[in-house]
Structures are given as C-alpha cells and as structure tokens.
C-alpha cells in the first residue's frame, strides 16, 4: 500500500513526548499532568544597519531553544513527579532526554515507528508546585535545551531512538550512514 501523508491539521495529541533521565530504565510518556508544552526556537540574530541603507538588516546566527511547560501534580506520573521534585528540592542542573514522536508521520513498512526528534533539556522550574486555595497544585517553568537536536525515528514499543533522515513525502527512513 502506498504511503499517503496526513491531509488534515495535526493536533497536539499527535505529537507525543517521551522522557528519560538518570534513575529510570525506559522512556516514559510525558503526558498526563502536563497541560502545556510549548516550544520556542528563540533565534539569535546579528542586527545592524549600514550608513548607506534606509533599512536595518537581521541575520540569524543560531538558536536558544526552550520549552515552556505547565501542568498539574499527579503523583503516579513519573515525569510529572520528577519535575515536581526538582522544583521542590531546588535541585540545579537536573537534565532529561526528550523524544518528540510525530505519530502522524509513521515509518513506511514498520509497526509502531514514527519520525522523531531527540533533545536534551535542563529543568528550570518557576512554580515548583503551588496554587490558590481550593485549586490544583500547579507546575510551571522552562525546559532549556542543551546542544543540538537529533532527528530520526522512535519505536514506541521498546523506547528506542535511531538517528537518521525521515522523508515526510514518502514516509521512508534512512539511518545515518546507510545509503549515504
């Protein structure tokens, strides 16, 4: 059967985030309890204007990516509890690896493998777990990306990531170094 790209708007629940950190053996779904996971590429620019020009110019020189997050404390969710503990214990330098899995972009001919992106993040809580009377315990902050993202595929059954190139038009995947 020929690959057909999705022809409708992709919804947030179709991009899953799995996370792993020191002390756990397999990535866990960072879903229940997280109410917002908004990426900000934050491009860095070198701006200027030459004396003979009317308009300023701007050249992108890199990125300072991060994720702003918010959520609710659900103690049986391993990822949410990890984020809560980092904030409440005022831990510094706590990292995790995130796999953003595009379930709308399956690997042609596979079962349970999808296009994915791997990033390393430091947890920087701003609200470590508090809220108003009668309300839910809220979590808010930033996941600051460290280093470059890697691109490839993710197997949701066994939690493995393989670096490579996914073709969004054909659904095909080539592992890095294969057929290059």
Residue ranges and their predicted role:
Residues 2-74, 121-137:
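Solvent-exposed edge beta-strands and adjacent loop segments
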Residues 8-14, 144-159:
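Short secondary-structure transition/capping segments
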Residues 17, 34-35, 83-91, 142:
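Generic hydrophobic, helix-prone segments enriched in Leu/Val/Ile
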Residues 32-37, 101-151:
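Short beta-strand and beta-hairpin "edge-sheet" elements
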Residues 54-120, 148-156:
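Extracellular/virion structural assembly segments
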Residues 74, 132-144, 158-168:
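Short, highly charged low-complexity linear segments
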Residues 154-180:
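Intrinsically disordered, low-complexity terminal/linker regions enriched in Pro/Ser/Gly
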């Amino acid at each position: 059967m020929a690959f057909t790209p999705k022809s409708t708007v992709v919804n947030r629940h179709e991009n899953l985030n799995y996370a792993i950190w020191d002390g756990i053996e397999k990535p866990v779904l960072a879903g229940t309890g997280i109410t917002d996971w908004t990426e900000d590429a934050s491009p860095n620019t070198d701006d200027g204007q030459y004396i003979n020009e009317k308009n300023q110019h701007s050249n992108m020189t890199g990125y300072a990516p991060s994720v702003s997050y918010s959520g609710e404390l659900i103690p049986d969710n391993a990822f949410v509890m990890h984020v809560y503990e980092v904030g409440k214990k005022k831990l510094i330098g706590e990292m995790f690896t995130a796999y953003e899995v595009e379930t709308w972009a399956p690997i042609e001919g596979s079962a349970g493998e999808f296009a994915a992106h791997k990033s390393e993040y430091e947890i920087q809580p701003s609200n470590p777990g508090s809220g108003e009377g009668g309300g839910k315990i809220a979590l808010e902050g930033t996941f600051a990306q460290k280093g470059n993202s890697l691109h490839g595929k993710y197997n949701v059954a066994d939690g493995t990531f393989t670096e490579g190139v996914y073709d969004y038009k054909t659904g095909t995947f080539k592992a890095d170094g294969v057929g290059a």
